[in-house]
Amino acid sequence: IKEFKADGTIGIGSPRASNESNFALRSMVGEENFYAGYSDVEHESMQVILDLASDTAFHSPSVREIETADAILILGEDVTNVAPRIALALRQSVRNKAKDLADESRIPQWQDAAVRELAQYERSPLSILSPAVSRLDDVASDRIIESLSAVVSIGHQIANKISASAPNTGTSTEHSEAIEKIAMQLKAAKRPLIIAGNSNGSDVIKAAANIARALHDGSDNSAIDLCLLVPEVNSVGMALMASAANPLGAALQKLQSGGAKRVIVLENDLYRRAAKETVGAALTAAAKVLVLDQVTTATTAK
């Protein structure tokens, strides 16, 4: 351990490690030598998420608050795979229309059979823009399956329909009716909710934020619910600890060039985070490699 405390040692954290473990490694190697433990694309997306989290125009809703949303738009994220508990909350939220109809008819909420009979197929709008099918499609009011670039473009067009001042980089008119419908549903909602995540890069996140900001500008300046999903248990903690200038790619490059002689890898399989050839070359170039993990991985085998 003593030789890893000397100069020339870098540390690579992990989004599946605890804050305490990541902090201990960062304290040992120094903040400037502590690198993010996920792909460079994910690192860029996480920086965007952190910036949006500090913006007062947006509110990060709890699971209970998600259940109260009365109009929802999901952009480019498979919620069931990334956050199954939130997916369940979304299934609950589409029943809010039925609850409103029951209140108008003076039917108590606890009379579930009567509420369902009254509502029939009436649901609160849940729109999904995605490059693939998802397990929430059965409760969606609108589904648009397009390429990721098209999803981003449609997102910006929806924002521009909500507020003319919102940036609009989309030009296609292929889904103009659906775009108009989704924009009107979000504008009419008492508690609209926009959902995106970092599974498909930062452009989708920026499009979601564009829509939420358009809703905020057209409201009484109350914060708009913007739910940004991350795939691992401590992705946010990892992003808060690793500098924006310290992506994983920079760490691998530093090892290959000889700028760092030793590396400590914390609870991470680097072969899942970057190109195998790049990771292999970096670990081979290092004089000493220390991997701390509870499971056997390609990185521990190296």
Where would I find each of the regions flagged by the language model?
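Catalytic alpha/large subunits of respiratory electron-transfer oxidoreductases
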Residues: 1-302
